[in-house]
Amino acid sequence: MSTDKTYCGFIAIVGRPNVGKSTLLNKLLGQKISITSRKAQTTRHRIVGIHTEGPYQAIYVDTPGLHMEEKRAINRLMNKAASSSIGDVELVIFVVEGTRWTPDDEMVLNKLRDGKAPVILAVNKVDNVQEKVDLLPHLQFLASQMNFLDIVPISAETGMNVDTIAGIVRKHLPEAIHHFPEDYITDRSQRFMASEIIREKLMRFLGAELPYSVTVEIERFVTNERGGYDINGLILVEREGQKKMVIGNKGAKIKTIGIEARKDMQEMFEAPVHLELWVKVKSGWADDERALRSLGYVDDL
């Protein structure tokens, strides 16, 4: 029987919307798990990404961005999910953007000050800072805000200093047995990952035209005799006008979304995928907590 020590722990990635938390998670894992888009609020579930390297297993919790606006049911639930994942972790990675500091950053910081877990401050997108002379004073300002475990300037996009973050994480993992098998990347089901891939393509190809009132339900996910998967996805929007937008002229938009989503699914599932998409109007779902529960938005709260 092996007596080699193993280390395992949970790490929360927190920050206001759109600072690059999902991109950082994907870089730390070495592959795409969390949906990334230039649009704020694209992460709606607490996706757990698992990175196992030798005796070390880091389990990452990718929170929705904590934000001030709490009017709609979906925003309240997203804030609750983010706040709850700050508790029960060994370490927190607080992601901020370049030299920007907003009331939302302040709100996240206040939540972290109340917590017990040590906090790494990841200052993302430093490669995009135009006035490099502003960077050092800003880092000094950040250092004065709380007793951070470390402050690391990074670029999640290019991977700059992401290995530094991973190294700090490894040092702070407690001695424990691994929670997941070595080849696990995420504890989310393939069905969930399929819906996230479709939602990312919607964000990518519709951009600012489409509000957050869009979600994806996987109605069918079965293996077929060809050794692949037959997947049916239902795209839910709030208004008829949004439905037309998703379908596009003569179905061109939904066809592109389907083709691109299928490519990503085949890469992720390592099998052929037959994907069919439909669009349906379900008015007011983002305001209805029961509808959100039925779509799996609160399965982990």
From Swiss-Prot:
Domain of life the protein comes from: Bacteria
Stretches for region G4: 124-127
Molecular-function annotations in GO: GTP binding; GTPase activity; ribosomal small subunit binding; rRNA binding; small ribosomal subunit rRNA binding
Family matches, as Gene3D superfamilies: 3.30.300.20, P-loop containing nucleotide triphosphate hydrolases
Keywords in alphabetical order: Cell inner membrane, Cell membrane, Cytoplasm, GTP-binding, Membrane, Nucleotide-binding, Ribosome biogenesis, RNA-binding, rRNA-binding
SUPFAM superfamilies the UniProt entry points to: P-loop containing nucleoside triphosphate hydrolases (SSF52540), Prokaryotic type KH domain (KH-domain type II) (SSF54814)
Binding site for GTP: 15-22, 62-66, 124-127
Region (G2): 41-45
Region (G1): 15-22
CDD domains noted in UniProt: Era (cd04163), KH-II_Era (cd22534)
Listed GO CC annotations: cytosol; plasma membrane
G5: annotated span: 154-156
GO biological process, one term: ribosomal small subunit assembly
Topology class, membrane: Peripheral membrane protein
Domain KH type-2 as annotated: residue spans: 206-283
Domain Era-type G: start-end pairs: 7-175
Region named G3: 62-65
Subcellular location: Cytoplasm; Cell inner membrane
Record text on subunit structure and interactions: Monomer.
Described purpose of this protein according to its UniProt entry: An essential GTPase that binds both GDP and GTP, with rapid nucleotide exchange. Plays a role in 16S rRNA processing and 30S ribosomal subunit biogenesis and possibly also in cell cycle regulation and energy metabolism.
Family of this protein: Belongs to the TRAFAC class TrmE-Era-EngA-EngB-Septin-like GTPase superfamily. Era GTPase family.
Protein name: GTPase Era
Taxonomic classification: Bacteria, Pseudomonadati, Pseudomonadota, Gammaproteobacteria, Enterobacterales
